[in-house]
Structures are given as C-alpha cells and as structure tokens.
C-alpha cells in the first residue's frame, strides 16, 4: 500500500471517530484513494480502530481505570449490597448504553432489505443525514442547559444516550459520536461531559470492531493480500496520534465554545458530498 493511502486512512479514522462530524461521509469523499477489500480491509480497519481506541483509553485513563474497578464492584454488589461508588455508577451506565450499537449492527447486517441498505448508503442519503443531524446537534446544543455534569448521569439518561446509537448504525452519515453528544446535550449535560460519556461508551464498540477484524483475518484466505503487518502498525500508530490530538482539541474547544463549528463543518461536508455526486458533477461538467 502507498504511504498516501496509509496516512489518509489513519487520519480519517483518528480524527473523525471522536469528533461529531461523521466518518461515513469522509469515507465517501476519499473512497477512490483508500478503497480496500478482503484481508487488506480487515487488517487496516482493525489497526486503525485499535489505534483510535488506545488514544481514547489513554486520554481518559482515570475514567477508564475507575470504570474497570467499578465493573468488579458491580460483580460483588449483589453480595455486599453496598451503595455503588462513582466508578461503579459509571461502569453501570456504560454497561446500559453499550449494547444498542452492537444490536444496531446486527439489525443493519441481517434485517435491512438490500434495496433500503443500498439507498441508505447512497451519497445523497449520507449527505442529507450529515446535514440534518448536524442541524439536530445545533438545536440540542442551543436548548440544552449546562447544569448537569458527571455525577448527574442516571441509568435512564445512559439508556437514552445509548439508544441514540441505533440511529447512527442504521443511517450512515449520522455519526455515532454526534448523535450521542446530541442526546446528552438535549438532556442538559455540559458539553465536556456529553463528549466524555460519548467516547467512553464508544470504547467497547471499537474493541468489538477491532476483534471482528482480527477474527476475519484468521478465516479469510491470504491470497492477494497487499497490506503488510508493517502497514497495519503504521496505520495504528498514526490513528493513535491523530485520535489523541483530536480528543484533546475537542475537549479544549468545548470548554470555551459551543458545537457550532462542528455543525457548520457538517453543513459544508454535506454540500461537498452533493457537489461531488454523479448527477451534480455530470450537470456541472
């Protein structure tokens, strides 16, 4: 694989995974350059997702450690009957929110008719969802208060935020990060807390995607594989660095301003997708 392909894939994954700007839309913009198939796709996707996941785990290492300790606390809760600590509540909220994205993936792969599946992945549908859900983020951010923080997360809120991921899985262009941050802002959570919880509940999903890719490598014939292990390591490293930087940038911006810059970016991205669509490009040509 060329260096350009590796860099584009890594940066696209690392930057777009955690920002509320839709990775599906970006994939469409550069699909001709980064097009992958077979074992190449499995290896590179697993590597890029793993790198991005490690970036989030490192950035939120204190929260992750608290959630892991809280998970063990949950296992003993029926016996001890003690009130849960902050880490225990966080682990429980993540546990409640996570299954929806996995369920959505099963629904998308097995129960969506092929004609609808094709329509949802068209450039027009992705462009429309990029714009529409950008507007929804704008609305939620404008109406949502700033009164609720980390300690205010309830199981009901975790359920609602987690359930919003179903939309992102089924409708490409929605953005999993974007829709969960939208839901959290609509529920009144501070912008930084909305982003933090969105990323924490994304960790199990990225882990599952990476594992799926690795399992696929073990069962897919090796013939014709162009990507090497070195390519995978390069992608993972670049995705890690760009992912860590994008998380830091997002959190810094949200401490000072609203989600409006990301909303405007989504509008521009949706318009760019429409402008590069076959019909529009043909008409302009």
Curated annotation (Swiss-Prot):
Transmembrane region(s): 40-60, 92-112, 122-142, 159-179, 197-217, 233-253, 259-279
Protein name per its UniProtKB record: Undecaprenyl-diphosphatase
Alphabetized PANTHER family for the sequence: UNDECAPRENYL-DIPHOSPHATASE
EC numbers, comma separated: 3.6.1.27
UniProt KW keywords: Antibiotic resistance, Cell inner membrane, Cell membrane, Cell shape, Cell wall biogenesis/degradation, Hydrolase, Membrane, Peptidoglycan synthesis, Transmembrane, Transmembrane helix
InterPro entries per record: UppP (IPR003824)
Pfam families assigned to the protein according to its UniProt record, in alphabetical order: BacA
Enzyme's top EC category: hydrolase
Domain of life: Bacteria
Cellular compartments annotated: Cell inner membrane
GO biological process: cell wall organization; peptidoglycan biosynthetic process; regulation of cell shape; response to antibiotic
Homology family: Belongs to the UppP family.
Known function: Catalyzes the dephosphorylation of undecaprenyl diphosphate (UPP). Confers resistance to bacitracin.
Note: Bacitracin is thought to be involved in the inhibition of peptidoglycan synthesis by sequestering undecaprenyl diphosphate, thereby reducing the pool of lipid carrier available.
Gene Ontology MF: a single term: undecaprenyl-diphosphatase activity
Reaction equation(s) it catalyzes: di-trans,octa-cis-undecaprenyl diphosphate + H2O = di-trans,octa-cis-undecaprenyl phosphate + phosphate + H(+)
GO terms for cellular component: plasma membrane
Membrane topology: Multi-pass membrane protein
